[in-house]
Amino acid sequence: MIIDRVEVETINSFSKLELFKEIYGLIWILPIFALLLGITIEVLVIVWLEREISASIQQRIGPEYAGPLGLLQAIADGTKLLLKEDILPSRGDIPLFSIGPSIAVISILLSFLVIPLGYRFVLADLSIGVFLWIAISSIAPIGLLMAGYSSNNKYSFLGGLRAAAQSISYEIPLTFCVLAISLLSNSLSTVDIVEAQSKYGFFGWNLWRQPIGFLVFLISSLAECERLPFDLPEAEEELVAGYQTEYSGIKYGLFYLVSYLNLLVSSLFVTVLYLGGWNFSIPYISFFGFFQMNKIIGILEMVIGIFITLTKAYLFLFISITIRWTLPRMRMDQLLNLGWKFLLPISLGNLLLTTSFQLVSL
């Protein structure tokens, strides 16, 4: 009986251990689901904001029938795309045609892994965080090129080639700007870069130490988002809809989602690299510095950090939306000349100057 009791207790302990493993596995997945839910809500808010801002710029009435103030218009559009027929080109490369949008969306979603939204609120604090973002974001144009090539349409293929050329042209200045920030912060981690700007509050932002790099990063990130005046890959007057021409239904909705996800990622990285991230702007003041032992206050501090990060990101969103609805589209030669003959030398010179100052200060 004693042996039987020991065996039963052992079995119960193993069953409890397995239960704990299952619970831990579910808890590990919860932050990912929370992040995906937050991203979905943010995209819906950005779509609504763009429609309201564009309506204000053009002096017209924006969406107002779908829900209060038109808040449900984006949900209605998404539902419509989900219910539409998924038409496949008869002579296209169907596997590549189906994979292209997924590659573009996944590459953008993976970028959120290294973005610190608030204090101690980041999925992966990696030592090469900013380089991982650059490497991952360079995968998205491959999906666009696959989509254009597999459509068996000259307009789609030309749009895919334009997307690849535009990404290559502006990825290099973007990388040089990130390298300059990493030299100032002595780290490639996004969390370390934010904490390096926290010493002097508003005056410690990299915006003041890297004004030229900030402007180059701003222009390059807008070009990476492929929005006006840099929307050459999908110019309606020239290419119908570019690489999206043959797409319909949910696949077309994925490309629509990529545009706003890319804009959100760029806004958050501008905030993290140049605007101090989650740090409050007033120097030498921490409202919760005396209450670090209280877990509730710690959670409140994290929530306020997320709010500050998103507020700064929405400033960049407002600028990008305003630029889209006020400036005309550039020609392809102007776009390439801006990237290779103007932004690239300036970003390289900025990196060399930053390196020189860092060596002198040692």
UniProtKB/Swiss-Prot annotation:
Statement: the UniProt record of this protein carries the keyword Nucleotidyltransferase: no
Annotated membrane topology: Multi-pass membrane protein
GO biological process: one example: photosynthesis, light reaction
Class of enzymatic activity (EC top level): translocase
GO cellular component terms, semicolon-separated: chloroplast thylakoid membrane
Ranges that cross the membrane: 26-48, 97-119, 126-148, 163-185, 254-276, 296-318, 338-360
Disulfide bonds: none
InterPro entries reported for this sequence: NADH_UbQ_OxRdtase_su1/FPO, NADH_UbQ_OxRdtase_su1_CS
Major subcellular location class: plastid
Single GO MF annotation: oxidoreductase activity, acting on NAD(P)H, quinone or similar compound as acceptor
EC code: 7.1.1.-
Keywords: Chloroplast, Membrane, NAD, NADP, Plastid, Plastoquinone, Quinone, Thylakoid, Translocase, Transmembrane, Transmembrane helix
Highest taxon of the lineage: Eukaryota
Catalytic reactions on record: a plastoquinone + NADH + (n+1) H(+)(in) = a plastoquinol + NAD(+) + n H(+)(out); a plastoquinone + NADPH + (n+1) H(+)(in) = a plastoquinol + NADP(+) + n H(+)(out)
Pfam families xrefs: NADHdh
Subcellular localization: Plastid, Chloroplast thylakoid membrane
Quaternary structure and interacting proteins, as annotated: NDH is composed of at least 16 different subunits, 5 of which are encoded in the nucleus.
Family: Belongs to the complex I subunit 1 family.
Biological role stated in the UniProt entry: NDH shuttles electrons from NAD(P)H:plastoquinone, via FMN and iron-sulfur (Fe-S) centers, to quinones in the photosynthetic chain and possibly in a chloroplast respiratory chain. The immediate electron acceptor for the enzyme in this species is believed to be plastoquinone. Couples the redox reaction to proton translocation, and thus conserves the redox energy in a proton gradient.
Name of the molecule in the record: NAD(P)H-quinone oxidoreductase subunit 1, chloroplastic
Name of encoding gene: ndhA
